[in-house]
Protein backbone atom coordinates (compact mmCIF):
# COMPACT_ATOMS: atom_id res chain seq x y z
CA UNK A 1 0.00 0.00 0.00
CA UNK A 2 1.53 3.35 -1.01
CA UNK A 3 2.32 5.95 1.63
CA UNK A 4 -0.47 8.30 0.50
CA UNK A 5 -3.14 5.68 1.21
CA UNK A 6 -1.59 4.97 4.58
CA UNK A 7 -1.67 8.66 5.46
CA UNK A 8 -5.32 8.99 4.43
CA UNK A 9 -6.34 5.94 6.46
CA UNK A 10 -4.34 7.29 9.40
CA UNK A 11 -6.14 10.66 9.09
CA UNK A 12 -9.48 8.84 9.12
CA UNK A 13 -8.49 6.85 12.21
CA UNK A 14 -7.30 9.97 14.05
CA UNK A 15 -10.58 11.73 13.25
CA UNK A 16 -12.51 8.69 14.44
CA UNK A 17 -10.47 8.63 17.65
CA UNK A 18 -11.15 12.34 18.14
CA UNK A 19 -14.86 11.67 17.62
CA UNK A 20 -14.76 9.03 20.35
CA UNK A 21 -12.76 11.18 22.78
CA UNK A 22 -14.59 14.50 22.31
CA UNK A 23 -18.11 13.16 21.93
CA UNK A 24 -19.56 15.35 24.68
CA UNK A 25 -19.26 18.61 22.71
CA UNK A 26 -21.14 19.09 19.45
CA UNK A 27 -18.60 21.45 17.86
CA UNK A 28 -15.71 19.03 18.41
CA UNK A 29 -17.80 16.16 17.09
CA UNK A 30 -18.69 18.13 13.96
CA UNK A 31 -15.04 18.98 13.32
CA UNK A 32 -14.00 15.35 13.69
CA UNK A 33 -16.84 14.28 11.40
CA UNK A 34 -15.67 16.78 8.78
CA UNK A 35 -12.15 15.37 9.05
CA UNK A 36 -13.52 11.89 8.46
CA UNK A 37 -15.49 13.07 5.44
CA UNK A 38 -12.41 14.83 4.04
CA UNK A 39 -10.31 11.69 4.30
CA UNK A 40 -13.10 9.62 2.71
CA UNK A 41 -13.33 12.16 -0.11
CA UNK A 42 -9.58 12.03 -0.72
CA UNK A 43 -9.59 8.22 -0.67
CA UNK A 44 -12.53 7.97 -3.07
CA UNK A 45 -10.95 10.54 -5.41
CA UNK A 46 -7.68 8.62 -5.53
CA UNK A 47 -9.53 5.35 -6.11
CA UNK A 48 -11.59 6.91 -8.91
CA UNK A 49 -8.44 8.25 -10.57
CA UNK A 50 -6.71 4.88 -10.34
CA UNK A 51 -9.68 2.91 -11.69
CA UNK A 52 -9.79 4.82 -15.03
CA UNK A 53 -13.54 4.22 -15.15
CA UNK A 54 -15.53 7.33 -16.20
CA UNK A 55 -18.56 6.65 -14.00
CA UNK A 56 -16.39 6.32 -10.89
CA UNK A 57 -15.85 10.09 -10.90
CA UNK A 58 -19.42 10.59 -9.63
CA UNK A 59 -18.70 9.00 -6.24
CA UNK A 60 -16.47 11.80 -4.84
CA UNK A 61 -18.95 14.45 -5.97
CA UNK A 62 -21.85 12.62 -4.32
CA UNK A 63 -19.76 12.29 -1.16
CA UNK A 64 -19.17 16.06 -1.17
CA UNK A 65 -22.92 16.66 -1.50
CA UNK A 66 -23.64 14.47 1.51
CA UNK A 67 -20.84 16.14 3.48
CA UNK A 68 -22.30 19.58 2.74
CA UNK A 69 -25.76 18.45 3.86
CA UNK A 70 -24.31 16.95 7.03
CA UNK A 71 -22.43 20.16 7.79
CA UNK A 72 -25.53 22.30 7.25
CA UNK A 73 -27.69 20.18 9.54
CA UNK A 74 -24.93 19.99 12.15
CA UNK A 75 -24.42 23.74 12.19
CA UNK A 76 -28.17 24.34 12.39
CA UNK A 77 -28.32 22.06 15.45
CA UNK A 78 -25.30 23.78 16.95
CA UNK A 79 -26.86 27.22 16.54
CA UNK A 80 -30.18 26.01 17.93
CA UNK A 81 -28.58 24.46 21.00
CA UNK A 82 -26.20 27.35 21.67
CA UNK A 83 -29.00 29.92 21.37
CA UNK A 84 -31.25 27.95 23.70
CA UNK A 85 -28.81 26.74 26.35
CA UNK A 86 -25.58 28.68 25.78
CA UNK A 87 -23.56 25.43 25.67
CA UNK A 88 -22.76 22.93 22.96
CA UNK A 89 -23.08 19.72 24.97
CA UNK A 90 -24.51 16.70 23.17
CA UNK A 91 -26.84 15.82 26.04
CA UNK A 92 -28.79 19.03 25.29
CA UNK A 93 -29.99 17.42 22.05
CA UNK A 94 -32.35 15.23 24.07
CA UNK A 95 -33.94 18.34 25.56
CA UNK A 96 -34.90 19.94 22.23
CA UNK A 97 -38.59 19.65 21.49
CA UNK A 98 -39.78 20.48 17.97
From Swiss-Prot:
Q: What is this protein called?
A: NADH-ubiquinone oxidoreductase chain 4L
Catalytic activity entry: a ubiquinone + NADH + 5 H(+)(in) = a ubiquinol + NAD(+) + 4 H(+)(out)
**EC number(s) on file:** 7.1.1.2
GO biological process, alphabetically ordered = ATP synthesis coupled electron transport
The organism of origin for this protein:
Nasalis larvatus
Q: List localization entries.
A: Mitochondrion inner membrane
Instruction: Identify its membrane topology class.
Output: Multi-pass membrane protein
Function of the protein: Core subunit of the mitochondrial membrane respiratory chain NADH dehydrogenase (Complex I) which catalyzes electron transfer from NADH through the respiratory chain, using ubiquinone as an electron acceptor. Part of the enzyme membrane arm which is embedded in the lipid bilayer and involved in proton translocation.
Question: What molecular function terms (GO) are annotated for this protein?
Answer: NADH dehydrogenase (ubiquinone) activity
Assigned GO CC terms: mitochondrial inner membrane; respiratory chain complex I
- What InterPro entries does this protein map onto? NADH_UbQ_OxRdtase_chain4L/K, NUOK/Mnh_C1-like
Spell out where the chain crosses the membrane: 1-21, 29-49, 58-78
Q: Which gene encodes it?
A: MT-ND4L
Under the subunit heading, UniProt states: Core subunit of respiratory chain NADH dehydrogenase (Complex I) which is composed of 45 different subunits.
